[in-house]
Regions:
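An acidic, phosphate/nucleotide-engaging active-site surface
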Residues: 1-37, 252
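Short coil/turn connectors at secondary-structure junctions
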Residues: 19-23, 32, 40-41, 50, ...
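Mobile "lid/hinge" segments at catalytic clefts and subdomain interfaces of large enzymes
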Residues: 29-32, 39-98
Length: 279
């Protein structure tokens, strides 16, 4: 589609190339993912143990292509990059993938539905098929209002907290509303530079970020931030409200989100009384 024509460096941790290892075991969960479509398999190597160029540029590639066309699907543009790198650069590496498909319930905790072990892409495809069955929820019609609660101890930034957007946006109706209860969020980026760039540009939508990316060197040098800004916007399709304790109304609205005081939000949407699913 001509959205990206840059080269991508294939870099992995040098320890993986140490020939004294006769087996390298990569363990992980296959689950829907906003950048690659379905997480794990070779992503564990090229991103989990990869260099910054690969991480940044594949995040940008996924953002350029669009989350709605990627989430929960195999053979995304990013996955094709990983497949090419696997076939052309590391096929002699003594890798064994151990892939799981799991769900979680309050009653039973983590349930393992599948365990897939081997090196061939076929085992990943089998895990993908099972994960699509177990980890994707389909709704009969788009949702007008969605409330997400972010654990106070786990989510301290919108960099992580915006998973609330990634994981719900395909189910939310045009003109709908997403309310994110985020008692622990106190900054935007996980580091100072990312935080600065998010505050500078905001979550202004895919087309605007692509325009800003072409015009601004600081975004070009921080492609993962540019990708994050794209993923963190609804592109004007539905409203996003952050209910927080530690950021001001001006800070939240400054990055293009709506603001609600946390105490006001929990009076309406008490996470201790609401249950997962429809209420």
């Amino acid at each position: 589609e001509g959205l990206m024509d840059e080269s991508i460096d294939v870099e992995v941790n040098r320890r993986l190339l140490d020939e004294s290892y006769d087996l390298i075991i990569s363990i992980g969960q296959v689950v829907p993912h906003e950048v690659v479509g379905m997480a794990n398999y070779s992503k564990n190597i090229f991103v989990g143990c990869g260099g910054s160029n690969m991480i940044n540029k594949t995040h940008m590639l996924g953002a350029f292509y669009g989350l709605e066309r990627i989430m929960g699907r195999d053979f995304s543009p990013v996955r094709k990059v990983f497949d090419y790198a696997e076939e052309n650069f590391i096929k002699d590496m003594p890798l064994m993938y151990v892939l799981t498909v799991t769900t979680h319930t309050e009653e039973d905790g983590v349930i393992i539905h599948g365990l897939f072990i081997g090196r061939e892409r076929k085992i990943f495809e089998e895990a993908v098929a099972l994960s699509q069955e177990k980890n994707l929820e389909f709704v009969e019609k788009p949702l007008k209002k969605v409330v997400v609660y972010l654990d106070e101890q786990e989510f301290k930034s919108t960099w992580l907290g915006n998973k609330a957007i990634y994981r719900t946006r395909m189910a939310i109706a045009d003109g709908g509303e997403l309310i994110v209860l985020a008692p622990g969020v106190r900054r935007f980026g996980e580091d100072m530079e990312n935080d600065r760039l998010i505050r500078k540009y905001g979550y202004v939508g895919r087309m605007k970020v692509l325009e800003l990316y072409k015009q601004n060197e600081d975004l070009q040098n921080n492609q993962s931030v540019a990708a994050h800004l794209i993923h963190g916007s609804s592109d004007g399709r539905f409203s996003i409200t952050y209910a927080v304790k530690h950021l001001t109304k001006e800070e939240i609205e400054g990055v293009n989100f709506n603001y609600m005081p946390y105490e006001e939000a929990v009076k309406k949407y008490n996470p201790e009384k609401l249950k997962d699913g429809f209420n």
